[in-house]
Regions:
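Blade-level signature of beta-propeller repeat domains, shared across WD40, Kelch, NHL, RCC1
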Residues: 240-290
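Beta-rich, blade/repeat-based domains predominating
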Residues: 10-24, 53-71, 94-110, 139-157, ...
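A short beta-strand motif characteristic of beta-propeller blades
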Residues: 3-9, 45-51, 86-93, 135-141, ...
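Flexible "stalk/tail and boundary" regions
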Residues: 42, 63-65, 80-81, 90, ...
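Hydrophobic alpha-helical segments and helix pairs
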Residues: 83-139
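A short loop-to-beta-strand structural motif that recurs across blades of beta-propeller domains
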Residues: 36-38, 74-76, 125-128, 167-169, ...
Length: 290
């Protein structure tokens, strides 16, 4: 079985939201706490960084170029240079207590972004969707920390995780992609790690980065663990599929909340890893505006 390898000579603070661009042969990701979007062009190893004025929770590439970016206080459209062009909406949570976190697009090119509640043990976060006409809509509440967004290949299910509560949910979707009542897909026990960012493969299996769990796990459509890949760091944060055949897994990791001793012992924490796998991942749509 292949093992994860470091992709490039870079160590971040809280890398998340890895996003593959097949057209560019490039990997994008955010460093949330640094307020950055990174781009790494695999053929040339060129690494560039866009800096923003506040934390960047998640983003998606736009069909017409540039990004849709969920920052702490709101969601913006930018050009390809990261210049803010239009504010889509404010953060519907209290931005002093909850920042935007994980997100992405569905097959219809709509953008989703969830928040992460900061202080205390309180489910004050939510998940919202930006439709193609830029209308914002809150679609789920009662969340402590949103993560793990992915969609089944048949578009009948939306998957999310609530990281602090250690649970992955799945939510049925109707023909228009509107959500029904969510249900528990998998609950994690103490010591297993907690579900962070995720991706979906073409067989309908859900790949989850298990924060504090030292591993990436693949789950069947019924929630059974099928495979796991051990990581050389404690806290993987998210995965995405890419490469020419979509059989390369890119993995972000973090060194947030690690003391100096742990960082010295596991110096690759915060790195970006690459892992060849035997199944192709689902391709992600760009954000489509109409």
């Amino acid at each position: 079985m292949a093992e994860p390898q470091l992709l490039l000579n870079y160590i971040g603070h809280l890398p998340e939201c890895p996003t593959w661009s097949a057209e560019e042969h490039a990997l994008y990701w955010a460093d949330i706490l640094e307020g950055e979007i990174h781009r790494y062009h695999l053929p040339t190893a060129e690494h560039t960084v866009l800096s923003f004025h506040e934390e960047v929770g998640c983003f998606a590439l736009r069909e017409q170029g540039g990004f849709i970016v969920a920052m702490r206080t709101g969601i913006w459209l930018t050009d390809k240079h990261g210049l803010l062009r239009r504010k889509v909406c404010d953060n519907p949570s209290n931005p002093q207590l909850a920042r935007f976190n994980d997100g992405g697009t569905d097959s219809l090119g709509r953008f989703y972004a969830g928040t992460f509640w900061g202080p205390g043990d309180y489910n004050g976060a939510l998940l919202m969707r930006i439709d193609n006409d830029l209308t914002p809509k809150v679609i789920q509440c009662d969340i402590h920390g949103h993560n793990g967004l992915a969609f089944s290949p048949d578009n009948q299910w939306m998957f999310t995780s609530d990281t602090p509560n250690g649970v992955i949910y799945r939510t049925p979707l109707d023909e228009q992609g509107e959500p029904g009542r969510r249900e528990v897909f998998r609950q994690f026990k103490e010591g297993e790690g907690i579900p962070d960012g995720a991706a979906m493969d073409v067989e309908g299996c859900y790949w989850s980065a298990l924060f504090d769990g030292w591993r990436i796990a693949r789950f069947s459509p019924q929630g059974e663990q099928l495979e796991e890949y051990r990581m050389p760091v404690r806290c993987p944060t998210m995965v995405c599929f890419g490469g020419d055949d979509m059989k390369t897994l890119f993995i972000t990791t973090t060194r947030e909340n690690m003391d100096a001793d742990e960082v010295a012992k596991y110096p690759l924490s915060g790195g970006i890893f690459i892992l060849p796998v035997n199944v192709a991942g689902m391709k992600k749509s760009r954000f489509i505006e109409r």
